Amino acid sequence: MKHMSIRAEEISALIKQQIENYQSEIEVSDVGTVIQVGDGIARAHGLDNVMAGELVEFSNGVMGLAQNLEENNVGIIILGPYTEIREGDEVRRTGRIMQVPVGKELIGRVVNPLGQPVDGLGPINTTNTRPIESPAPGVMDRKSVHEPLQTGIKAIDALVPIGRGQRELIIGDRQTGKTAVALDTIINQKDEDMICIYVAIGQKESTVRNVVETLRKHGALEYTIVVTASASQPAPLLYLAPYAGVTMGEEFMYNGKHVLVVYDDLSKQAAAYRELSLLLRRPPGREAYPGDVFYLHSRLLERAAKLSDAKGGGSLTALPFIETQAGDVSAYIPTNVISITDGQIFLQSDLFFSGVRPAIDAGTSVSRVGGSAQIKAMSKVSGTLRLDLASYRELEAFAQFGSDLDKATQAKLNRGARTVEVLKQGLHKPLRVEKQVIILYALTRGFLDDIPVVDITRFEEEFHAWLDSNATDLLEEIRTTKKLADDDKFAAAINGFKKVFVASE
């Protein structure tokens, strides 16, 4: 075996080469220390360069959102269980602001405000995300509301019409049918090429389950996303839920689609935000809400819009809910949201308990922009409806005191009683707009004046079934032209049914 000589110069050259090629990868991350934790809030020291609204990560993997940037510490709201976080734990910056997954993969699913599925149907396969806080469309990016959003509820489509891109507040006490109005509207969007997002804020888990089952039963879950932050969730998730919902909707809006977002309800979001603000030691204002509670709702609802054609012509319609206490609409949060929205639908508990359902108060409900979105046929037949109802309510009060009424007053009372009956509607029975037009035409033109009040509901149900088999051409004409057909056609259809209708004894 030959003896191999090792030269010192070769070894030193190799070592020098290795040293020259050596690259040390140093990872620099901003790390802080938790100095206080409790009630879903943590304070951390050392995160000097953190951004407002930046996501931070605790050592146990729970995420947080930097909110209060103070001189010597940062107030963080914790987006998950905070009981595992201890004083002295490490917290590090992520360099990202909060984002949620978006896209058509979410349709038909139930998710939490972080976009994580909670329906047990496996993971959601989408890589697209959008920041949860984004600016609302600018003035030049918008277009005035001109397309109708048919709710399928006669009292709304006739008296307080809603257009695509509008913000219409639904306000009333608890147990007055607010959620039912929203669900009927979602169910009525079938075949309308509309994507619906139902955001449940602070609801009971059982209530959310019922909502999901109702949507599934009526085939509405195929075009609906449910975002839920139930009453058992920490306050930060209740605060973030509406923003998560609108962010998911914006993805479709900016792609030229039409979206309906229901926030059920914003009173609970405001209460959650008040809780967070007080725990972060922000100064309280009226009713202990922080000074920026108006901005909390305005920046959310301003993201609803009808986009200009240059931006794709998509729309996002918002139906925020506010729960009042004993009908007090002059409280802080109700007045704030009334001033932000383009109209409101008042639901009165007195009407609800007297059997008028949906319990819409026609006198105080308004739609500030929806009138221009109403189809011509509907605006023609519903023109006198509000006045008829208002004069009926007024005369009804006087009629209780006197029995001797002249014929004109008696006629108004009779027409008013029939109007109230026609505007009643069963739960989850939305009505197509062409059928609404025909029954309202019959009402306002006096065709129902000789039908007993007790028979009005039955007359309407049987009339709709009769139309489906005997007057499909008339329904199709209203659906396609969106205008009133010839008066003779209407009269022939209505009188044709009246001949076969049998009034009760």
From Swiss-Prot:
Q: Which stretches does the entry tag as region Disordered?
A: 118-138
Its UniProt entry gives the catalysed reaction(s) as:
ATP + H2O + 4 H(+)(in) = ADP + phosphate + 5 H(+)(out)
Signal peptide (from-to): none
Q: What's one Pfam family here? A: ATP-synt_ab
- Locate the site labelled Required for activity: 365
Tell me which UniProt keywords the record has, alphabetically.
Answer: ATP synthesis, ATP-binding, Cell membrane, CF(1), Hydrogen ion transport, Ion transport, Membrane, Nucleotide-binding, Translocase, Transport
> What are its E.C. numbers?
7.1.2.2
Molecular function (GO) terms for this protein are: ADP binding; ATP binding; proton-transporting ATP synthase activity, rotational mechanism
The answer to keyword Hydrolase applying to this record is no
Primary location recorded for the protein, binned into one broad class: membrane
**Topology in the lipid bilayer:** Peripheral membrane protein
Indicate whether RNA-binding appears among the record's keywords: no
Subunit description: F-type ATPases have 2 components, CF(1) - the catalytic core - and CF(0) - the membrane proton channel. CF(1) has five subunits: alpha(3), beta(3), gamma(1), delta(1), epsilon(1). CF(0) has three main subunits: a(1), b(2) and c(9-12). The alpha and beta chains form an alternating ring which encloses part of the gamma chain. CF(1) is attached to CF(0) by a central stalk formed by the gamma and epsilon chains, while a peripheral stalk is formed by the delta and b chains.
Its function, per the record, reads: Produces ATP from ADP in the presence of a proton gradient across the membrane. The alpha chain is a regulatory subunit.
Q: What is this protein called?
A: ATP synthase subunit alpha
**Species name:** Bacillus cereus (strain ATCC 14579 / DSM 31 / CCUG 7414 / JCM 2152 / NBRC 15305 / NCIMB 9373 / NCTC 2599 / NRRL B-3711)
